[in-house]
From Swiss-Prot:
Its main location: membrane. It is a multi-pass membrane protein. The chain crosses the membrane at residues 4-24, 29-49, 55-75, 87-107, 115-135, 152-172, 177-197, 207-227, 230-250, 268-288, 291-311, 324-344, 356-376. InterPro entries: Cation/H_exchanger_TM, K/H_exchanger, K_H_efflux_KefB, Na+/solute_symporter_sf, NAD(P)-bd_dom_sf, RCK_N. SUPFAM superfamilies: NAD(P)-binding Rossmann-fold domains (SSF51735). It is found in: Cell inner membrane. The keyword Ion transport applies. This is Glutathione-regulated potassium-efflux system protein KefB. Keywords: Antiport, Cell inner membrane, Cell membrane, Ion transport, Membrane, Potassium, Potassium transport, Transmembrane, Transmembrane helix, Transport. It comes from the Bacteria.
């Protein structure tokens, strides 16, 4: 592609995303399926705006690369070591069992056994990009099924290396003996990357951060991600695996959150580009001429993978309520199939339309996953949101709650217990099915579902409720829910959890004044106790705590329109001096009886 062609392609991608994704969300089919449909529309088999699909698909793999880097940042080496059994146990079993079954089925058609083996391995892989995106949307990241799903995906990335090495052996074009020197050099280069990353990355980022220029830090982050990807690609390894390792090496560094913030916008755009490219690659000509074969293949592929994954989840001890989520989210073919099948085709393993048929099957299977997960959600909703059994004694018998609590993690549970202890009628919405299952056993009235869906809020009693308490883990979900409540249920008093000052600013800008920063109050209370241990009278320490709370809240409101770091730092220094003056003035003016609060503790 020439420069002008790339620019035109970029404009078309952005237009397709802007037009298709909001429409898909409104129709309730999800953003991922919206991207795929947009790709079909602008691709060579749709309106034909873009024809060079392979080049764009290769470039768009960077979305997966950025995603794996961010995931690596969330997993330190010790956490990764804890997952070793699920990675090499469940992950290996899934790949081997799925590949064997699918290869056997392909051999029943006109596939040669060598082509069937390659086809089985390629179809056994799942889409890292789609699975992780859906797991995040469904709140599976911290659940048992989500952790197990990530382990399976990680093993699949590791399996890329031997799978690609197997192709020339099956084609009979491999050398009689391996070039051990070349293999040894690649191993040494990989080990060198690990050692260099372990001891050099943090000092380098410390040096860059000292410059104080945010753009340079972002550029260094992009250089690290793209450099790791290119280095691994040069070694013949998975680019996504390379950036994942780079992320893990920085997971315990002080720059982890800053790195994630710098990368996140690029990750989202490139992931969207990847899904659009996959949609563009769908060969509708092959679909039309082999419609029955393709439909049967997609159904069989998804069914086989669900069966294998469900059985493995059961053997691993995953809760029954989470097994279908785990199996469904990994049931599609993956992006690695495009690479593996292209390599096999260059070695003349496939005949006729075999490669095209397999790629169409993979693409359509990816399109089934968002729809399948919606069906799983509906099934879980019916199972866990139905009438309670006769022997259950729920806290709430009234269908018209006074309060709706969104999210029932540690933060939400404290609020819920306080409200129920005071005989308030509440309904809890939670999208982590394992939490729903556990809480209902203890008699809590907890419903499964995504609270950002207006219909679910309405059925939960939002039209009759007085207040809604939002305790979501993700700030984006909180702000989306605030907007929905203000638009559809303006009578509700909105109370929200803020993870920090940034989220608090966003809530204030949205008109939400009743919020709590999750660590602020507990930190203030511990600070008050510290003042008492240092000899300050309990009453005076309590007054100091109240003064600090009022001043900090005032600062929070004043700094909303300010975005420059220098302005915020200057105002923070001014506030600290003001706080010191308040305490000093109070010490001089107040005369207290120091035995008045002796029993405060």
């Amino acid at each position: 592609m020439e420069g002008s062609d790339f620019l035109l392609a970029g404009v078309l991608f952005l237009f397709a995303a802007v037009a298709a994704v909001p429409l898909a969300s409104r129709l309730g089919i999800g953003a991922v399926l919206g991207y795929l449909l947009a790709g079909i529309a602008i691709g060579p088999w749709g309106l034909g705006f873009i024809s060079d699909v392979d080049e764009i698909l290769h470039f768009s793999e960077l979305g997966v690369v950025f995603l794996m880097f961010i995931i690596g940042l969330e997993l330190n080496p010790s956490k990764l070591w804890q997952l070793r059994r699920s990675i090499f146990g469940v992950g290996a079993a899934q790949v081997l069992l799925s590949a064997a079954l699918l290869a056997g089925l392909l051999m029943l058609t006109d596939f040669a056994w060598q082509a069937a083996v390659v086809g089985g391995i390629g179809l056994a892989m799942s889409s890292t990009a789609m699975a992780l995106q859906l797991m995040r949307e469904k709140g599976m990241n911290r659940s048992e099924s989500g952790q197990l799903g990530f382990s399976v995906l990680l093993f699949q990335d590791l399996a890329v290396i031997p799978a690609l090495a197997l192709v020339p052996l099956l084609a009979g074009s491999a050398d009689e003996h391996f070039d051990w020197m070349k293999i040894g050099m690649k191993v040494l280069a990989f080990v060198g990357m690990l050692i260099g990353g372990r001891y050099l990355l943090r000092p380098v980022f410390r040096f860059i951060a000292a410059s104080g220029v945010r753009e340079v830090f972002t550029a260094a982050t992009l250089l690290l991600v793209l450099g790791s990807a290119l280095f691994m690609d040069a070694l013949g390894l998975s680019m996504a695996l390379g950036t994942f390792i780079a992320g893990v090496l920085l997971a315990e560094s002080e720059y982890r959150h800053e790195l994630e913030t710098a990368i996140d916008p690029f990750k989202g755009l490139l992931l969207g580009l990847f899904f659009i490219s996959v949609g563009m690659s769908l060969n509708l000509g092959v679909l039309y001429t082999h419609l029955l074969w393709v439909v049967i293949s997609v159904v069989v592929l998804v069914a086989v993978k669900i069966l294998v994954l469900y059985l493995l989840a059961r053997l691993y001890g995953v809760r029954s309520s989470e097994r279908m989520q785990f199996a469904g989210v990994l049931s599609q073919g993956g992006e690695f199939a495009f690479v593996l099948f292209s390599t096999a085709s260059s070695q003349r393993l496939f005949q006729g339309d075999q490669m095209a048929l397999l790629l169409v099957t993979v693409t359509l299977s990816m399109m089934t996953t968002p729809l399948l997960m919606k069906l799983v959600d509906k099934w879980l909703s019916r199972q866990f949101n139905g009438p309670e059994e006769e022997d259950e004694k729920p806290w709430v018998n009234d269908d018209k709650p006074q309060v709706i609590v969104v999210g029932f993690g540690r933060f939400g549970q404290v609020i819920g217990r306080l409200l129920m202890a005071n005989k308030m009628r509440i309904t809890v919405l939670e999208r982590d099915i394992s939490a729903v299952n556990l809480m209902r056993k203890y008699g809590y009235k907890v419903y499964y579902g995504d609270a950002t869906q207006v219909d679910l809020l309405r059925s939960a009693g939002a039209e009759a409720a007085v207040s809604i308490v939002i305790t979501c883990n993700e700030p984006e979900d909180t702000m989306k829910l605030v907007e929905i409540c203000q638009q559809h249920f303006p009578h509700l008093h909105i109370l929200a959890r803020a993870r920090g000052r940034v989220e608090a600013h966003e809530l204030l800008q949205a008109g939400v004044t009743q919020f709590s920063r999750e660590t602020f109050s507990s930190a203030l209370e511990l600070g008050r106790k510290t003042l008492v241990t240092l000899g300050m009278h309990p009453h005076q320490a309590q007054r100091a705590q109240l003064h600090f709370r009022r001043l900090d809240m005032r600062m929070l409101r004043e700094l909303i329109p300010m975005h420059a770091d220098t302005v915020q730092i200057s105002r923070a220094r001014e506030a600290r001096r003001e706080l010191e003056e308040i305490f000093q003035r109070e010490m001089q003016q107040e005369r207290r009886q120091l035995d008045g609060w002796d029993e405060f503790e």
